[in-house]
Amino acid sequence: MKQYLALMEHILAHGAVKTDRTGTGTRSVFGYQMRFDLNQGFPLVTTKKCHLRSIIHELLWFLQGDTNVAYLHEHNVSIWDEWADDKGNLGPVYGAQWRSWPTQSGKAVDQISQIIEQIKTQPDSRRLIVSAWNVGELDKMALAPCHALFQFYVADGKLSCQLYQRSCDVFLGLPFNIASYALLTMMVAQQCDLALGDFVWTGGDTHLYSNHMEQTKLQLSREPHALPQMNILRKPESIFDYQFDDFELVNYQPHPHIKAPVAI
């Protein structure tokens, strides 16, 4: 994950000092891109230990269209707790937009089912896009979507995915986002009988929080290890039928975890 460390170095060297919604303060750059060949290993950061269980369960939760943290709590995942109300609800965040985007007619669009069908039947389409940025419902969401839109691309029998992330917490959030969308790309490729291509990450306001600087410097002092491999142990009937035990990460040798505060 040398690309990730290079991004951190770029922000430290060239980032602008900015204020932000949380009042924490950031050092930020605008418009940055990284590319990961998914045939060269699973892009999970090795310069600190990442909590893979949270990444997988969050993705499965999104795919079910769920927007209440109860499922996450059942699996000891607390990454959304700071934004949930007293009943565990988050409003129409990612899962709702992915699976039931409301239309003017009163119906809803299941973008995930739609995209799978389009990849299978129209692989050269330039409309293989899923969006979570529903302007009409932003005020109902506990947190506006950071990873706002992703697009699939099929060429030479390989599936690639590009994510546009309008706002990115590089130290805490980005390792999760890269791994989550890389895994989603693997799942979609399996469902569509395609080989793996690239995962491309594109960031808008790409920042390090001011209270993550020491942690960032510690991480930059560590030598990255070889990437692990992710195995999917079975092919479920649909994209919605994967379970946590279907995924096996092998040869993950990370440096120790680095604790840092979340900006809320």
From Swiss-Prot:
Compartment annotation: Cytoplasm
GO cellular component: cytosol
Keywords, ordered alphabetically: Cytoplasm, Methyltransferase, Nucleotide biosynthesis, Transferase
Gene Ontology biological-process annotations: dTMP biosynthetic process; dTTP biosynthetic process; methylation
Superkingdom per UniProt: Bacteria
EC number, as in UniProt: 2.1.1.45
Binding site for dUMP: 21, 126-127, 166-169, 177, 207-209
Active site: 146
Pathway: Pyrimidine metabolism; dTTP biosynthesis
Keyword Zinc listed: no
Single Gene Ontology MF annotation: thymidylate synthase activity
Catalytic reaction(s) noted: dUMP + (6R)-5,10-methylene-5,6,7,8-tetrahydrofolate = 7,8-dihydrofolate + dTMP
CDD domains: TS_Pyrimidine_HMase (cd00351)
Annotated residues for binding of (6R)-5,10-methylene-5,6,7,8-tetrahydrofolate: 51, 169, 263
Family matches, as InterPro entries: Thymidate_synth/dCMP_Mease, Thymidate_synth/dCMP_Mease_dom, Thymidate_synth/dCMP_Mease_sf, Thymidylate_synthase, Thymidylate_synthase_AS
Record's subunit section: Homodimer.
Purpose of the protein: Catalyzes the reductive methylation of 2'-deoxyuridine-5'-monophosphate (dUMP) to 2'-deoxythymidine-5'-monophosphate (dTMP) while utilizing 5,10-methylenetetrahydrofolate (mTHF) as the methyl donor and reductant in the reaction, yielding dihydrofolate (DHF) as a by-product. This enzymatic reaction provides an intracellular de novo source of dTMP, an essential precursor for DNA biosynthesis.
UniProt record similarity statement: Belongs to the thymidylate synthase family. Bacterial-type ThyA subfamily.
Name of the featured protein: Thymidylate synthase
Organism field: Shewanella denitrificans (strain OS217 / ATCC BAA-1090 / DSM 15013)
Source lineage: Bacteria, Pseudomonadati, Pseudomonadota, Gammaproteobacteria, Alteromonadales
